[in-house]
Structure formats: structure tokens, C-alpha cells
């Protein structure tokens, strides 16, 4: 029986096989944030000298990449990337996700938007029929905390401030429990339209293109329909 850590490693290795397919001196790889992304970063070290560089979705990931001797580029200097690789807190069969447990949701969305394909890596426990058991992170401009919290409460959520946490952008996170997420793209737009919200941790309007889910029987690959 593989442990969860071993499953995460398996998912990271599957993504590294995709990097092998696209690697080249002009290639830039987008890299996410979190425990599974950390394993991907560690494996990416073997491509040192075979890539132009990487773009990181957080200061944490940038430091880990640099520690392996991989170039970390400013997104403003990058026009496109073949793939962006990141984990998920939850993912459904439509490849909609909840992300942001590590607090990097805004930069994750931004970096992912520049990649041609979004590759989600996770262990099979993250696959759910409907999103919402994991509290939904929402990045909020500090002065709008209470106003946004009231708006989230009107949507049926129970927002709680993530104590002692500040995002790389200098903002706060509200973690919202109790939401019924039957229409993930619709809810993502509704929450993002609340004044003071930077973005929410729903990745549904632009979800993953491919999910590589590690199971006890190997990698299960899901691809976005249509």
C-alpha cells in the first residue's frame, strides 16, 4: 500500500515525463505551489541546463527552484509556456478545482493563464464528485475584509480569516466553509465580482486541461472534455 507521500511522488513523476516531451533550450515551465508541486520542483532539478527557465507562482516555489539551480524568470518577460504544473486541494470530473490552501491562488491563476496546458497533479484522494468539502480560499484586499465576508455569508458561506497569514501580494485570505458548489464557474464569477475580492480559489472558468491522479494501481489520466 503506497502512502499519500508516495502517491504524490508518483503524480510528480508523471508530470516530469511531460516535461521530458517538451524540454528544450527555449522552453519555460510554469510551476505551482504546494506539497505536490514541491516534489515536482525537486524532480525538475534533473532538467537543469535543458530548459530556458521556469516561472514560479509564489516566493516559496521560486526559492525552491533557485535552490536547485533552475532559472526563475519574471512572468512579464515570458510570452508563453507549453505547460503549467500544479496540485489541487480538490478536483472534480470536469477538472474544476479548489486551490489556494497554500495561499498562492492569485499568482497561480495568473501564471496558469500564460501556459498552453494546465497539468494538475494530485493523489486520488483529491478527486471529488462535487467541490466544496475543502473550505474555499478567497484572497481579499485587507480594508474590504468585513464587507467581503458579509457578501460571502449572503452566498451561504461561513468565512473565516486565515490568522497570521499574508499573501505574497500583501493581502489576506478568507477560508469559506459551507458553500454549495453546484455551478463552479458561476460561483467563481459571482465571488470574483464582489468588490475587494482579488480572486477566489475556484479554478473552473479556466480549469485544468489534464489531471494526473496517482492511485494504488498507477496514474489515472483525466482530460478536459471538449
From Swiss-Prot:
It comes from the Bacteria. It catalyses: aldehydo-D-ribose 5-phosphate = D-ribulose 5-phosphate. The active site is at 108 (proton acceptor). Keywords: Isomerase. Pfam families: Rib_5-P_isom_A (PF06026). One of its GO terms (cellular component) is cytosol. Its EC number is 5.3.1.6. Substrate binds at residues 33-36, 86-89, 99-102, 126. Belongs to the ribose 5-phosphate isomerase family. PANTHER family: RIBOSE-5-PHOSPHATE ISOMERASE. This is Ribose-5-phosphate isomerase A. It comes from Bordetella bronchiseptica (strain ATCC BAA-588 / NCTC 13252 / RB50) (Alcaligenes bronchisepticus).
Amino acid at each position: 500500500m503506497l502512502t499519500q507521500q508516495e502517491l504524490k511522488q508518483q503524480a510528480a513523476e508523471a508530470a516530469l515525463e511531460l516535461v521530458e516531451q517538451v524540454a528544450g533550450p527555449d522552453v519555460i515551465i510554469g510551476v505551482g505551489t504546494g506539497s505536490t508541486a514541491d516534489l515536482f520542483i525537486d524532480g525538475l532539478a534533473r532538467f537543469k541546463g535543458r530548459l530556458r527557465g521556469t516561472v514560479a507562482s509564489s516566493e516559496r516555489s521560486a526559492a525552491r527552484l533557485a535552490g536547485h539551480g533552475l532559472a526563475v524568470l519574471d512572468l512579464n518577460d515570458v510570452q508563453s509556456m507549453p505547460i503549467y504544473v500544479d496540485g489541487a486541494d480538490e478536483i472534480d470530473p470536469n477538472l474544476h478545482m479548489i486551490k489556494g490552501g497554500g495561499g498562492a491562488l492569485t499568482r497561480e491563476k495568473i501564471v496558469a493563464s500564460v501556459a498552453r496546458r494546465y497539468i494538475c497533479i494530485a493523489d486520488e484522494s483529491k478527486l471529488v464528485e462535487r467541490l466544496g468539502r475543502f473550505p474555499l480560499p478567497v484572497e481579499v484586499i485587507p480594508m474590504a475584509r468585513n464587507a467581503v465576508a458579509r457578501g460571502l455569508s449572503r452566498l451561504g458561506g461561513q468565512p473565516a480569516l486565515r490568522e497570521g497569514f499574508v499573501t505574497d501580494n500583501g493581502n489576506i485570505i478568507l477560508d469559506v466553509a459551507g458553500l454549495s458548489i453546484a455551478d463552479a464557474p458561476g460561483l467563481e464569477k459571482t465571488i470574483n465580482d464582489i468588490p475587494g475580492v482579488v480572486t477566489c480559489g475556484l479554478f473552473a472558468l479556466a480549469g485544468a486541461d489534464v489531471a494526473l491522479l496517482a492511485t494504488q494501481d498507477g496514474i489515472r489520466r483525466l482530460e478536459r472534455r471538449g
